[in-house]
Each structure stands twice: as structure tokens, then as C-alpha cells.
Amino acid sequence: METFYEVMRRQGISRRSFLKYCSLTATSLGLAPSFVPQIAHAMETKPRTPVLWLHGLECTCCSESFIRSAHPLAKDAVLSMISLDYDDTLMAAAGHQAEAILDEIMAKYKGNYILAVEGNPPLNEDGMFCIQRQALPREAQAVAADCKAVIAWGSCASWGCVQAAKPNPTQATPIHKVITDKPIIKVPGCPPIAEVMTGVITYMLTFDRIPELDRQGRPKMFYSQRIHDKCYRRPHFDAGQFVESFDDENARKGFCLYKVGCKGPTTYNACSTVMWNEGTSFPIKAGHGCTGCSEDGFWDKGSFYDRLTNIHQFGIEASADKVGGTAAGVVGAAIAAHAAASVIKRLSHDPDAAARAESRS
């Protein structure tokens, strides 16, 4: 199988453009310029990796997102970087012909292909709600048997998502509960950001290993910070400036959306840094709060427009009287607590004083 560099040269791409591509790839992955030679070497020497993409219960939004990646472009990822040999949504072949391709790749590249799963397998009724040549739970286990890693695309494969919402009649289940003996990289989101999807694949192909994961199995390079941490509306949150309803003056001023349900403070994703549509925007920038779609169980945690909790802070708009009065109250409470603690400590160290206090009472 050809290397990525050989494919690019065959397509008439110059060495200069190739190195520029490697530099942009390093930037998109958040890597230092010193990694560019490593990326170039990997793309020059390593053959393209076969990818088998299975679909479960889903809406195909992950595929829709993937094909809109700006860097790398989906066409470069599919036609040059990886060898997407099986994807029953995108491939031309169907039926027995498609199944023959799947079997051929599994046998020919045993231990060297990546399994990507979009959607989740249903366990109720022996998996009859999602059937290819066999129920998806068994099909996924069979394809995973000789893969080197599994990528769980989206919140469906990662957590279960809306198919697993209560009462979950199909028993839709995240893929890590069906495939238990392989490393699984979770890329949650409904859907995930396009550049996050292609970035994970690029990292795996470049360094021939899975990216560093957090405790939940998500790549730290994209899921180590809350959306709230880098949100451009964060200064309004800190200042106590909030939208109270979507049609008020504060909404027009671009104030923080926390009080109208934004889940950014509890959601780990790269939306506020990578954004969507080639870095054009993301939901909060468009005026709608984060729904927390990359977090486990978001679909059963109440309305998207309910605030997480009440917060009590002054912000820069608070009056001096309010701040001073509250501060005085806090200081008074602290003095009373300190006095009580001092009495208790003195009595505990002076038995006679304790006896005298008891006799007086």
C-alpha cells in the first residue's frame, strides 16, 4: 500500500506544499514546530492505514461532520491519509459485494486496521434493531477481534446518546461495553467537531499510537478543557453580566448565557477554540447556550434551558454598599465562629473551668 507522501506526489503536489501541509497538521494538533520533521517522516515512510467504519443506531451526523473537515480536508483524509475501505454509508458497493470487501480487509490487514464505530449497538431482542449480515453487537465484536484500535465516533458510540434515553427500549449501549478487549478512543459530541475527528486520525497515523486519553477515554488534546474556560463570553460571566431571556437587551449585548441554560461550565470539548465551519462559529457565538452534547447522560439531565445551579457573585456591577454589607456579615460570622472555637478549646484544656461553667448553668 502506498504511503501518504507517495499518493500526494502522484497527485502532482510539490515537496514544498507537502512540508507546508505537515506544518499545518502540527498546528491543528496543537504540536510545537519541532514535531514537523516527525510528521513528514511518518507520512513519507508509513503506508496508509485501512479503516473499517461501522454504523449502529445513529443519525449519521458524525459522518456529516467528518466530510466537512477543513484541515485536513475530508478528501485528503479519505483518499490520501487513510484507506477507508469499508463504510456502508459512503461506499459505492452494497450487499454481498460490500461484505466481501470487509472480509478481505480483515484478513489481509489482520492486526493493522482501525475500527471506527458511529452509532451504538442495541442489545435488546438479540440486537435485532440494527442488523447488517448479523446483529451489530456480534458484527462489531467480530470486526474488532483483529483491529489495533477502536475509535468511538460521537456521543452515540461513546455514551449511548438519545437512543439510550430513558426508558431505552432497545437497550442502546456504548461501544466500550460491547468491545472490552481493545483500546477505545472516545470522540464524543453530537456530532464531534470535524477537525477533532480528522485530528485524532492524523495523530494516530503520524505517531503510530493512540493519543493520550483522559480518565473517560477521550483525547486530552481536544477534551482537556471546559468550553467555559476559553469562551469569549467568559468575562461577562466573571462580571456577573447574564442574559435573562433570549430576547432581552443583555442577549443583544452578547452577555453570558449561563442563566438560560448554557452547559459550557461542565462540558469538556474544543468548541470555543477550534469552533465549527472552518473556525467560523460555535453555538454560543451564534447566541445559543451549550447543550453539553459531548458529556455522558446529557440527554436525560433535564431541559437544555434550565441553569445548572444558582450562583451568588458580585461581579463588577455590584454596588459598594452591597459588597461592604456582605463583607461585614462574613467578617462578623467569622469572629463569632472564632470566639466559639476559642471557648471550646479553653474548656477542653481546663477541667476546673469546665466544671465552673457547668455549675453556673
UniProtKB/Swiss-Prot annotation:
In the Enzyme Commission scheme, what number(s) does this protein have?
Answer: 1.12.99.6
Binding-site residues for [4Fe-4S] cluster 2, renumbered to this chain = H228, C231, C256, C262
Q: How is the cofactor bound?
A: Binds 2 [4Fe-4S] clusters.
User: Which residues bind [4Fe-4S] cluster 1 per the record?
Assistant: C59, C62, C156, C190
Post-translationally, this protein is described as follows, namely: Predicted to be exported by the Tat system. The position of the signal peptide cleavage has not been experimentally proven.
Identify the enzyme class: oxidoreductase
One short Pfam name that applies is: Oxidored_q6
- Where in the cell does this protein reside? Cell membrane
GO biological process assignments: anaerobic respiration
Swiss-Prot/TrEMBL cofactor(s): [4Fe-4S] cluster; [3Fe-4S] cluster
Keywords assigned by UniProt, alphabetized: 3Fe-4S, 4Fe-4S, Cell membrane, Iron, Iron-sulfur, Membrane, Metal-binding, Oxidoreductase, Signal
Q: Where does [3Fe-4S] cluster bind?
A: C271, C290, C293
Bilayer topology term: Peripheral membrane protein
Q: Which GO terms describe its cellular component?
A: [Ni-Fe] hydrogenase complex; ferredoxin hydrogenase complex; plasma membrane
Leader sequence segment: 1-42
* Reactions accelerated catalytically: H2 + A = AH2
Q: State whether it acts alone or in a complex, and with which partners, per the record.
A: Heterodimer of a large and a small subunit.
Q: Could you tell me what this protein does?
A: This enzyme recycles the H(2) produced by nitrogenase to increase the production of ATP and to protect nitrogenase against inhibition or damage by O(2) under carbon- or phosphate-limited conditions.
**Protein name as annotated:** Uptake hydrogenase small subunit
Source taxonomy: Bacteria, Pseudomonadati, Pseudomonadota, Betaproteobacteria, Burkholderiales
